[in-house]
Amino acid sequence: LANSIQAKYLKLEINDYQTGTMGWRNAGIQEIRAYSNIPDPTKVTDIRQVTELTVAKDGQSLVLPTLPGKVSLIGSNKQGVIDLQNHIYKPLTDQRVKVMVEQVQDSHTFTKEFEVLIKGVHQDEGVGVKPKVAPAVQQWYGKEGQSSITSDTVLATGDSGFDQAATFYQSDLASRGLELAAGDKQAQKRIEFKKVENKGYGKEGYGIAIQDGVITIEAATNTGAFYATRTLLQMGENNLQNGEIRDFPSFSHRGFMLDTGRKFIPYDTL
């Protein structure tokens, strides 16, 4: 309206409509807005007006906009890069991350999704071929050289607390005819397990470093270490490309349907 008016109620009256082939007198409303005053389009007060998010100068977090009410990060499809505490973990290579930002003001809640580019340590995935495993690893950087797991390789768990994951892996390798003994982190050929914190692995993520006969598995939990061994099993034991892996699930809840009526699988395999 050109001039403001005083009103308590707003009435929408449909004077014309198209019945369509079914003869239904329906009307669709895409958007209607009423303001107590004319808003200033140059003043950003709603998260939906924000067009992009930027990374803080120190690279440790995203810069969330200053808006009325409370603004917080409530979603991330790569929490191993940007977690819900708005902490950025430097990835191996450039990563595009989708995040959801929420604005709560009085009794109103607004959300908007943004895509943010987080620069990695390396500009590309290095040399060699990215491991072909399922599910695919989130990050990979290949280095010169290859490594193999042989009968001379030892399993070194140290004080990591990941003995259960190591034992499962040891049993799996034994079923392939490869017997590995327990050892320590001084061995020249070893698979070493390390417990780490504050690297963004969460409950199920992990890191794998392969370098000239030494394979290092790091995780925050036994579950993460176990998933690392599942990736290693798929990669095999011979001529592994030297390199680094950072992996974590995109979603905390995942599932699938298995039709046991048509596909018979032993319980132990499941």
Language-model-detected regions and their locations in the chain:
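Aromatic, loop-rich ligand-recognition surfaces of beta-strand-rich domains
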Residues: 1-39
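Beta-strand secondary-structure signal
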Residues: 11, 98-102, 115, 190-192, ...
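Beta-rich interaction/scaffold domains
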Residues: 38-126
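Residues on the solvent-exposed faces and adjacent turns
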Residues: 75, 219, 260
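Acidic, contiguous N-terminal accessory segments
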Residues: 117-249
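Surface-exposed loop/turn motifs at beta-strand-loop junctions within extracellular Ig-like
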Residues: 16-18, 103-107, 221
